[in-house]
UniProtKB/Swiss-Prot annotation:
Identification of the protein by name: Uveal autoantigen with coiled-coil domains and ankyrin repeats protein
GO biological process: intrinsic apoptotic signaling pathway in response to DNA damage; intrinsic apoptotic signaling pathway in response to oxidative stress; negative regulation of inflammatory response; negative regulation of non-canonical NF-kappaB signal transduction
A GO MF term: actin binding
Cross-link (Glycyl lysine isopeptide (Lys-Gly) (interchain with G-Cter in SUMO2)): 1020
Tissues/organs with expression: Highly expressed in muscle and heart, moderately in liver, kidney and pancreas, and weakly in placenta and lung.
Gene that this polypeptide is encoded by: UACA
Subcellular location, record wording: Nucleus; Cytoplasm; Cytoplasm, Cytoskeleton
C-alpha cells in the first residue's frame, strides 16, 4: 500500500513504514519544540533520519531551520549524519544553504564530511557561496573543504559567487586559494559570467586579483563580449583599462610614424625644399590631427560595435525564447508525472475504500464479538510539491559565420595605395554574410513556428488529460461520499445496538444489586463475570465505533484533499490555458518581429548594395581631411611665397620705372637682352607656378564637389540611421547608460558636422585666396609683358583682365550664395540633432528603474537557478524510476511486436484496407457518374422520342382536320339550329332559376319585415311595461332583469337584421349582375343568329363559341351553387331567429297574465294607498304591526342563537371526542404502568423462587427463561402499542372526517345566514317602502358577520392544535416503538407525561 507513496525517496530509506511517532517528531521539529523532540526520541523505534513522502526527515528539517537545540538533541540521540534527502543533500548542505553557521559548526564537530556531493555535484561550499554566508565558508575551508571543487556544469564556488554578485565572498575564496581563471564546461571563466550578469563589484575584485581579460570561451567570445551583452558601460571601461595596461604595444604603434605622414612629408619636400623647419611644425600639427581623427574613428568603431551587440542581443533574446519553450516542454513533462502520481493516489484511495468496506462488513457480521485493535496508519499522505521553475537562460553567443570581419574586428586605417578591388571583395563578403544571416533567421523562424505549434498541441492534450483526471476524481469523490453515507448509517445502527446493550447492562446491574441484598455470593460472582464480559463487549463495540469514526474522519480528510487537488488541477489547467494564450500571442509577436526583421534585412541589403561601407567612408573621410589640411598648409606657403615675390617685384618695379625713364632717353641692346632674359625666366617660372596652381585649383574644386556629395550622403545616412534607430534598433526601455552613449554619439556627430562645415568654409576662403592670387599673378605677368609691349596692347589686356575680375566677382557672389545655403543646411541638421536629443530623452528609461529591474531580475534568476537545481535532482530520481518503467515497456513492446507480426501475417493493415476501399469507392463513384450520365442521356433521348411522337401525332391531327376542312369547308345550317335550341333551353332554365331565387328572396324579405314588426311590437310592449313599472314601483329588480334580457335580445335581433339586410343587398347586386350577364348572353346569341342567317360560319368559330358558352354555363352553374349555399345559410339563420322568437315568447309573459299581474299590483297599491291615508287614524294598528315585526326579529335572533348553540354543541362534541381520545391514551399509559408494575412483581416473585431454589443452574435457566419471557412480553407490549397507534391514527382520520363534516355544516349555516339577510332586506323593504336599509339591520348583519368570523378562527385554531398534537404523538410513539432513547425522545416522553397529567387533572 505505502510503498508507492515513497517512490520518490531513495531505496535505502524505505525499510520502515511511516509511524505516528515519526509524524509527531516531524511536527515538533518544524515547530522547534525541543522538549517534544527529546520525549519522542526517548521512545523505541524512533529514527530521526527516516524520510517522509516529500523525501525529507526531521534531522533535515532541523538543519534547514537552524534549530540548534533540536539538532543537538538529535545528534546526542544518535543519527546517521550522511543521510541525504531526495535532492541528495545532507544536513551540512542544508545548513550551508540557509546560512546557519552554528548548526554547520555543530555538524562539523560531529565529523560531517565536507566533500559530500548532491545530485547536481555541488558541495556544501557551493551552497554557502550562493547563500552569501562568509562565516560558514571560513568554517568549511578550515575543515578542509576543496575551494576549486566543480559541480556537474563545471562551476566552482567562485564562479557561483560572481554569478550571484557576491564580491566579499569572491575575495574570501580568492584569499583561500581559489583559481580565478577556472573554466566551466563551456570554457567560461568567472570574469565572463560576472560581465554577463552585470556584477561590477565582483568584476573589480577579479580584475584586481589578476583575472585574465583576453581569455576566450568555446564559441570564441571574450569577457568584453559578455559585458556588451550585459549592457554595462562601467564594466566595459574596466575591461578596457585592464586590456590597455596589459597591452603596451599600442603605445609603440602610436609613437611610430605612419605611412601617410611620410607621404605628406615627401609631398611637402617636393613642393618647397626651402621651408624645412616650418614643414616639421606642420607635420607635428598633422600628427596631432591624425591622432584626433583616430580617436574619432575609435569612437565610431565603438558605436558600430554597440549596434552589433544590439543585433547580437536580439539574437540572444531569440535563443532565450527557444530555451523558454524547452523549459515549457520540461514543465509539461513534470505535469504529466504529477498527473501519474495523482492517478496512483486515486488508486490507493480506492484500495483503502475497499479495505474499509471489508472492515464494515466484518463489523456487521460480528458486532457483538470482541473487536481487534487495528493499528492506526496515517492515510493522509502529503504530495511532493514540484516547483515548476524556468530553466536558466544561458547566454549563447552569435554564431561565428554570422559575424563578418567588419563587425568583429576593429576598423583599421585604409592605406592610400589600397586598390578598390579589395573593398569590393569585402563588400561582397559582407553581403554574403548578411544573406546567410537572413537564411538562418528564416530557418530559425520556421523552427520556432513548428515548435510553437507542437507545444500548442501538447498543451491541448494536457488540458484534455486534466479534464479526464478531473472527471475521474469527481467520480471517485462521489463514490467516497456514498461510502461515507453508508458508514454513517452503519454508525447509527451500531449506536442503537450499543444503547440496547446499555439498557441490558443496567438491567443486569439492578439484578446484581437485588442479589447482593439477598446474600447469594455465587450468583453475585457469576453475574459479575457476566458484567465483565458485557463490559468487555461494550468496550470492544465502543472501540470499534471509535475506529469507525476515525476512519470516517480520515475519509473526510481524504475527500477534502481530493477536493484541494481538484482545485489545484483547475488552477493548473487555467494557468496552462493562460500560458497557451500567452504562447500564441508570443508566437504572433515573434512572427511580426521576424517579418519586420526580414524587411529590415532586405532594406539593409539594398542599402548595402548602394552605399559605401563604413570603413571605406571613414578612410576616405580621413584622407580628405588630411589632404585638405595639407592643401591649406600649402596655400599658406604659397601666400608666403607670394608675399616674398611681391617684395621681390617691388624693387623690380622700381628698376623698371628707372629703366623706362632711361629707355625714354636711350636703350642699350645688351641691357635689353639681359632684362629680357631675366624677365623671360621669371615669367617662365611664374607660368609654371600658375599652371601648377590652376591644376591644384581644379583638383581642389573636384575634391570639394566630392566632399559635398559625401556630406549629402552622410546626411542621408544620418537620417536613415536616426529613422532606423527610432523604429527598429532602439527599444523603449533601455538603460541610461545607452542614453549616455547615444548622447556621446550625437555630440561626436555634431562635432564632425561643425568640423566639416568649418573646413568647408576654410576651403572656400582658400579658393577665394587662390583666385585672388591667380588674378594678381596674371596682372603681374601682364605688366611684365607690357614693359616691352606697346600701350594699345596693354590696354586691351587690361580690359580682358577687368572682364576676368568681374567674372571672378560673379563667381565669388555665387560661392557666397552656396555658402549661405550650406549654412542653412547646417542649421537644419543642428535642429534635427536637437529633435533627436529630445526623442532620446523622452523614449529612454532612467538608470534607477533599470537598476531596480535588473536587481529584481537577478534575484528571480537566482531563485530560478536554485529551484532548477532542486528540479534537476528530482528529475534524476524520476529518471531512475523511468528506467524500470522503460524495462517494463520494452517487455510490452516485445509482446506488441509479436502481436503486430501476427496481425501482419493474418490481417491486412488499415491503410491498405482504406486505400482499397477508397479505390473501390472512386471506381464506384466513376461507375455511378457514368451510369448517371448514361441515364441522363437515355432520359433525354426518351424525351426527344416522346416529343417526336407528340409532334407526329399533332401533325396527323392537323392532317385529319385539314382533310375534314377540305371535305366540309363550311358547317351546315342544321348543326347551328341545334346549337340555338340548346342555348335557348339553357336560357330558359337559367331564367327559371332566377325567378325561383327572386321569389325566395322576396319571401325572406317579407319574413324579415315580419320580424321587424314583431320586434317593434315587443319594444312598444316593453316601453309600456317600463312606464307601468315606473308608475307603480313594483318588483323593480325583476323588471330591470327582464328589460336587460329583452334589450340584449333586441340587440341580437337588430344585429341579425343588419346581417340579413347586408346579405339581401349582396343578393340584389348578384341578381343585377346575373341580369346583365343574361342580357349580354342574349345579345351574343342574337348576334350569332344574325351571323348564321347572313352567312355560313366556319367550324373553328363554332367550336370557339361552343367552348366560350360551355365555360359561361359552368361559371353560371358554380354561381348558382354558391347562391344556393348562401340561401341555405340564410334559411338556417331564419329558422334560428324563429326559434329565438319562440323562446322569447315562451320565456316572456303573455298579455293576459301581464294584465292580471298588473291588476293585482294595482289592487295592492290601492290597498297600500288606503292604508297610508288611514295611517293617522289607525296608528295603533301600525304600532301593533311594528310590535309584530319586532317579535319576528326576536324570533330570527333566537334562531341565530340556536344556530350558534348548535355550532357550540358541535365544538363541544369535538372537544368531547378529543377528551375521550386523550383519556384512552391515558388509560393505555396506565395499563403500561400496571404492566410494568406486574413485571416488577413477577421479577420479585422470581427472585423469591430463586431464593427457595438451591441449584445455581436452575436459577440461571430461570433467569434466561425470565429474560426471554420479558423480551416476549416487551415484544407483545410493543405490538400492543403499535395496535394502539394504528387505532389512534384511525381515530385521527375519523376526527378529520368529522371536522370536514363540521366545515360543511358551517358552510350550510353561512348560507342560512345569507338567506336570513335577504329575508331581513325584504322585510325592511316592505316596512319602509322604497327607502334605504335601516341602521339596525346593518348593525345586525355586521354583528352576525363578526360572530361568523370569530367562529371560523376558533375552528382553524382548534384544527391546528389538533394536528400539532397528532404529530407529536406520532413522532414520540414511533421513536418509543423503535427503541430509540435519545435525549430528544426522552424530552418528548416527558412532554407526553406532562400532557397526560394535565388531562387527568
Amino acid at each position: 500500500m505505502m510503498s508507492c507513496w515513497f517512490s520518490c525517496a531513495p531505496k535505502n530509506r524505505q525499510a520502515a513504514d511511516w509511524n505516528k511517532y515519526d509524524d509527531r517528531l516531524m511536527r515538533a521539529a518544524e515547530r522547534g519544540d525541543v522538549e517534544k523532540v527529546s520525549s519522542i526520541l526517548a521512545k523505541k523505534g524512533v529514527n530521526p533520519g527516516k524520510l517522509d513522502v516529500e523525501g525529507r526527515s526531521a534531522f533535515h528539517v532541523v538543519a534547514s531551520k537552524g534549530n540548534l537545540e533540536c539538532l543537538n538533541a538529535i545528534l546526542i540521540h544518535g543519527v546517521d549524519i550522511t543521510t541525504s534527502d531526495t535532492a541528495g543533500r545532507n544536513a551540512l548542505h542544508l545548513a550551508a544553504k540557509y546560512g546557519h553557521a552554528l548548526c554547520l559548526q555543530k555538524l562539523l564537530q560531529y565529523n560531517c564530511p565536507t566533500e559530500h556531493v548532491d545530485l547536481q555535484g555541488r558541495t556544501a561550499l557551493h551552497d554557502a557561496a550562493m547563500a552569501d554566508c562568509p562565516s560558514s565558508i571560513q568554517l568549511l575551508c578550515d575543515h578542509g573543504a576543496s575551494v576549486n571543487a566543480k559541480d556537474v556544469d563545471g562551476r566552482t564556488p567562485l564562479v557561483l559567487a560572481t554569478q550571484m554578485c557576491r564580491p566579499t565572498i569572491c575575495q574570501l575564496l580568492i584569499d583561500r586559494g581559489a583559481d580565478i581563471n577556472s573554466r566551466d564546461k563551456q570554457n567560461r571563466t568567472a570574469l565572463m559570467l560576472g560581465c554577463e550578469y552585470g556584477c561590477k563589484d565582483a568584476v573589480e575584485v577579479l580584475i584586481k586579483n589578476g583575472a585574465d581579460v583576453t581569455l576566450l570561451d568555446a564559441l570564441g567570445h571574450d569577457s568584453s563580449y559578455y559585458a556588451r551583452i550585459g549592457d554595462n558601460l562601467d564594466i566595459l571601461t574596466l575591461l578596457k583599462t585592464a586590456s590597455e595596461n596589459s597591452n603596451k604595444g599600442r603605445e609603440l604603434w602610436k609613437k611610430g610614424p605612419s605611412l601617410q605622414q611620410r607621404n605628406l612629408s615627401q609631398m611637402l619636400d617636393e613642393v618647397n625644399t626651402k621651408s624645412n623647419q616650418r614643414e616639421h611644425q606642420n607635420i607635428q600639427d598633422l600628427e596631432i590631427e591624425n591622432e584626433d581623427l583616430k580617436e574619432r574613428l575609435r569612437k565610431i568603431q565603438q558605436e558600430q560595435r554597440i549596434l552589433l551587440d544590439k543585433v547580437n542581443g536580439l539574437q540572444l533574446q531569440l535563443n532565450e525564447e527557444v530555451m523558454v519553450a524547452d523549459d515549457l516542454e520540461s514543465e509539461k513533462e513534470k505535469l504529466k508525472s504529477l498527473l501519474a502520481a495523482k492517478e496512483k493516489q486515486h488508486e490507493e484511495s480506492l484500495r483503502t475504500i475497499e479495505a474499509l468496506k471489508s472492515r464494515f462488513k466484518y463489523f456487521e457480521s460480528d458486532h457483538l464479538g470482541s473487536g481487534s485493535h487495528f493499528r492506526k496508519e496515517d492515510m493522509l499522505l502529503k504530495q511532493g510539491q514540484m516547483y515548476m521553475t524556468d530553466s536558466q537562460c544561458t547566454s549563447t553567443g552569435m554564431p561565428v559565420h554570422m559575424q563578418s570581419r567588419s563587425m568583429l574586428r576593429p576598423l583599421e586605417l585604409a592605406l592610400p595605395n589600397q586598390a578598390s578591388y579589395s573593398e569590393n571583395e569585402i563588400l561582397k563578403k559582407e553581403l554574403e554574410a548578411m544573406r546567410t544571416f537572413c537564411d538562418s533567421a528564416k530557418q530559425d523562424r520556421l523552427k520556432l513556428q513548428n515548435e510553437l505549434a507542437h507545444k500548442v498541441a501538447e498543451c491541448k492534450a494536457l488540458a484534455l488529460e486534466c479534464e479526464r483526471v478531473k472527471e475521474d476524481s469527481d467520480e471517485q469523490i462521489k463514490q467516497l461520499e456514498d461510502a461515507l453515507k453508508d458508514v454513517q448509517k452503519r454508525m447509527y445502527e451500531s449506536e442503537g445496538k450499543v444503547k440496547q446493550m446499555q439498557t441490558h447492562f443496567l438491567a443486569l446491574k439492578e439484578h446484581l444489586t437485588s442479589d447482593a441484598a439477598t446474600g447469594n455470593h455465587r450468583l453475585m460472582e457469576e453475574l459479575k463475570d457476566q458484567l465483565k464480559d458485557m463490559k468487555v463487549k461494550y468496550e470492544g463495540a465502543s472501540a470499534e465505533v471509535g475506529k469507525l469514526r476515525n476512519q470516517i474522519k480520515q475519509n473526510e480528510m481524504l475527500v477534502e484533499e481530493f477536493k484541494r487537488d481538484e482545485g489545484k488541477l483547475m488552477e493548473e489547467n487555467k494557468r496552462l490555458q493562460k500560458e497557451l494564450s500567452m504562447c500564441e500571442l508570443e508566437r504572433e509577436k515573434r512572427g511580426r518581429k521576424l517579418t519586420e526583421m526580414e524587411g529590415q534585412l532586405k532594406d539593409l541589403s539594398a542599402k548595402l548594395a548602394l552605399s559605401i561601407p563604413a570603413e571605406k567612408f571613414e578612410n576616405m573621410k580621413s584622407l580628405l581631411s588630411n589632404e585638405l589640411n595639407e592643401k591649406a598648409k600649402k596655400l599658406i606657403d604659397v601666400e608666403r611665397e607670394y608675399e616674398r615675390s611681391l617684395n621681390e617685384t617691388r624693387p623690380l618695379k622700381r628698376e623698371l620705372e628707372n629703366l623706362k625713364a632711361k629707355l625714354a632717353q636711350h636703350v642699350k641692346p645688351e641691357e635689353h637682352e639681359q632684362l629680357k632674359s631675366r624677365l623671360e625666366q621669371k615669367s617662365g617660372e611664374l607660368g609654371k607656378r600658375i599652371t601648377e596652381l590652376t591644376s591644384k585649383n581644379q583638383t581642389l574644386q573636384k575634391e570639394i564637389e566630392k566632399v559635398c556629395l559625401d556630406n549629402k550622403l552622410l546626411t542621408q545616412q544620418v537620417n536613415n540611421l536616426t529613422t532606423e534607430m527610432k523604429n527598429h534598433y532602439v527599444p523603449l526601455k533601455v538603460s541610461e547608460e545607452m542614453k549616455k552613449s547615444h548622447d556621446v554619439i550625437v555630440d561626436d556627430l555634431n562635432k564632425k558636422l561643425s568640423d566639416v562645415t568649418h573646413k568647408y568654409t576654410e576651403k572656400k576662403l582658400e579658393m577665394e585666396k587662390l583666385l585672388m592670387e591667380n588674378a594678381s599673378l596674371s596682372k603681374n605677368v601682364s605688366r611684365l609683358e607690357t614693359v616691352f609691349i606697346p600701350p594699345e596692347r596693354h590696354e586691351k589686356e587690361m580690359m580682358a583682365l577687368k572682364s576676368n575680375i568681374t567674372e571672378l566677382k560673379k563667381q565669388l557672389s555665387e560661392l557666397n550664395k552656396k555658402c549661405g545655403e550650406d549654412q542653412e543646411k547646417i542649421y537644419s541638421l543642428m535642429s534635427e540633432n536637437n529633435d533627436l536629443k529630445k526623442t532620446m530623452s523622452h523614449q529612454y528609461v532612467p538608470v534607477k528603474t533599470h537598476e531596480e529591474i535588473k536587481t529584481a531580475l537577478s534575484s528571480t534568476l537566482d531563485k530560478t537557478n536554485r529551484e532548477l537545481v532542486d528540479v534537476k535532482k528530482k528529475c534524476e530520481d524520476i529518471n531512475q524510476e523511468f528506467v524500470k518503467i522503460k524495462d517494463e515497456n520494452e517487455i510490452l513492446k516485445r509482446n506488441l511486436e509479436n502481436t503486430q507480426n501476427q496481425v501482419k501475417a493474418e490481417y491486412i493493415s488499415l491503410r491498405e484496407h482504406e486505400e482499397k476501399m477508397s479505390g473501390l469507392r472512386k471506381s464506384m463513384k466513376k461507375v455511378q457518374d457514368n451510369s448517371a450520365e448514361i441515364l441522363a442521356k437515355y432520359k433525354k433521348s426518351q424525351e426527344e422520342i416522346v416529343t417526336l411522337h407528340e409532334e407526329i401525332a399533332a401533325q396527323k391531327r392537323e392532317l385529319d382536320t385539314i382533310q375534314e376542312c377540305i371535305k366540309l369547308k363550311y358547317a351546315p345550317i342544321i348543326s347551328l339550329e341545334e346549337c340555338e335550341r340548346k342555348f335557348k333551353a339553357t336560357e330558359k332554365e337559367l331564367k327559371e332559376q332566377l325567378s325561383q331565387q327572386t321569389q325566395k328572396y322576396n319571401t325572406s324579405e317579407e319574413e324579415a319585415k315580419k320580424c321587424k314588426q314583431e320586434n317593434d311590437k315587443l319594444k312598444k310592449e316593453i316601453l309600456t311595461l317600463q312606464k307601468d313599472l315606473k308608475d307603480k314601483n313594483v318588483h323593480i329588480e325583476n323588471s330591470y332583469e327582464t328589460e336587460r334580457a329583452l334589450s340584449r335580445k333586441t340587440e341580437e335581433l337588430n344585429r341579425q337584421l343588419k346581417d340579413l339586410l347586408q346579405k339581401y343587398t349582396e343578393a340584389k347586386k348578384e341578381k343585377e349582375k346575373l341580369v346583365e350577364e343574361n342580357a349580354k348572353q342574349t345579345s351574343e346569341i342574337l348576334a350569332a343568329q344574325t351571323l348564321l342567317q347572313k352567312q355560313h360560319v366556319p367550324l373553328e368559330q363554332v367550336e370557339s363559341l361552343k367552348k366560350s358558352l360551355s365555360g359561361t354555363i359552368e361559371t353560371l352553374k358554380e354561381e348558382l351553387k354558391t347562391k344556393q349555399r348562401c340561401y341555405e345559410k340564410e334559411q338556417q339563420t331564419v329558422t334560428q331567429l324563429r326559434q329565438m322568437l319562440e323562446n322569447q315568447k315562451n320565456s316572456s309573459v303573455p298579455l293576459a297574465e301581464h294584465l292580471q299581474v298588473k291588476e293585482a299590483f294595482e289592487k295592492e297599491v290601492g290597498i297600500i294607498k288606503a292604508s297610508l291615508r288611514e295611517k293617522e287614524e289607525e296608528s295603533q294598528n301600525k304600532t301593533e304591526e311594528v310590535s309584530k315585526l319586532q317579535s319576528e326579529i326576536q324570533n330570527t335572533k333566537q334562531a341565530l342563537k340556536k344556530l350558534e348553540t348548535r355550532e357550540v354543541v358541535d365544538l363541544s362534541k369535538y372537544k368531547a371526542t378529543k377528551s375521550d381520545l386523550e383519556t384512552q391514551i391515558s388509560d393505555l399509559n396506565e395499563k403500561l404502568a400496571n404492566l410494568n408494575r406486574k413485571y416488577e412483581e413477577v421479577c420479585e416473585e422470581v427472585l423469591h423462587a430463586k431464593k427457595k431454589e438451591l441449584s445455581a443452574k436452575d436459577e440461571k435457566e430461570l433467569l434466561h427463561f425470565s429474560i426471554e419471557q420479558e423480551i416476549k412480553d416487551q415484544q407483545e407490549r410493543c405490538d400492543k402499542s403499535l395496535t394502539t397507534i394504528t387505532e389512534l391514527q384511525r381515530r385521527i382520520q375519523e376526527s378529520a372526517k368529522q371536522i370536514e363534516a363540521k366545515d360543511n355544516k358551517i358552510t350550510e349555516l353561512l348560507n342560512d345566514v345569507e338567506r336570513l339577510k335577504q329575508a331581513l332586506n325584504g322585510l325592511s323593504q316592505l316596512t319602509y317602502g322604497s327607502g334605504s336599509p335601516s341602521k339596525r339591520q346593518s348593525q345586525l348583519i355586521d354583528s352576525l358577520q363578526q360572530q361568523v368570523r370569530s367562529l371560523q378562527q376558533q375552528l382553524a385554531d382548534a384544527d391546528r392544535q389538533h394536528q400539532e398534537v397528532i404529530a407529536i404523538y406520532r413522532t414520540h410513539l414511533l421513536s418509543a416503538a423503535q427503541g430509540h432513547m435519545d435525549e430528544d425522545v426522552q424530552a418528548a416522553l416527558l412532554q407526553i407525561i406532562q400532557m397526560r397529567q394535565g388531562l387527568v387533572c
